[in-house]
Amino acid sequence: EIGVRLVGSEMCIRDSYKLNPDVSDLPDKLAKNINGVKLLVMGTVDTGGSGCVCPEHVMLKAILTNLVFRRDDVVIMDMEAGLEHLGRGTASMMDQFIVVIEPGARSVQTYVRIKELAKDIGVTKVRVVANKIRDESDREFIRSRIPADDLLGFISYSPTVIDADRKGLSPYDCSPDALDEIRAIKAAIDAKE
């Protein structure tokens, strides 16, 4: 167990947590089951200055290890934007990452950095879905910067999807065009396995 963490240059005592907790029963106990798909949601930082989420990441990594290696389940993770989970190796047992980017230089650079960090933790397949595509020039921008083998497809910019998000609705139910594009991306994922 670890009960000490560093804060700046000072040490402080914190609630201890196990590095290898038994989590085999948690997915079945805690998951929401929707049409045969189980959903687990990890919390987030609720208040500024509340400290790191190290215990939560230890728990998440243990749950993922259990699901991937012991159960041989299919796991899809929607990780928060950023690189911290790569530094922690939270998703190191995944077969591949799918990075959602937009047609901009910083977004492409984020993909490049994710690909580098993923390789460091043993994940060699990093695929791309290009989102908020307005026209052919956006598609060409993406194609000129992303290797063809990594590019899964495009999702068009859609006011309908934005309106659905503002209303708290699923774009899945509101935008048949986006749904068709997502189905094409799924077919591309299946074809590249």
What annotation goes with each model-predicted range?
Residues 42-48, 52-53, 64-86:
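Switch II (G3) loop of P-loop NTPases
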Residues 4, 31-32, 66-70, 90-92, ...:
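Conserved catalytic network of the ASCE P-loop NTPase/AAA+ motor domain
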Residues 45-47, 81-82, 104-106, 133-136, ...:
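Conserved nucleotide-binding/hydrolysis micro-motifs of P-loop NTPases
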Residues 62-71, 86-105:
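Inter-motif core of Ras-like GTPase G domains
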Residues 41-42, 99-102, 128-131:
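Conserved beta-strand segments of the P-loop GTPase G domain that flank and frequently precede/overlap
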Residues 2-7, 12-13:
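Single conserved hydrophobic/aromatic residue that forms the stacking wall/gate
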Residues 14-42:
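Alpha-helix-centered segments that form part of catalytic cores
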Residues 119-193:
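C-terminal lobe/tail of nucleotide-utilizing enzymes
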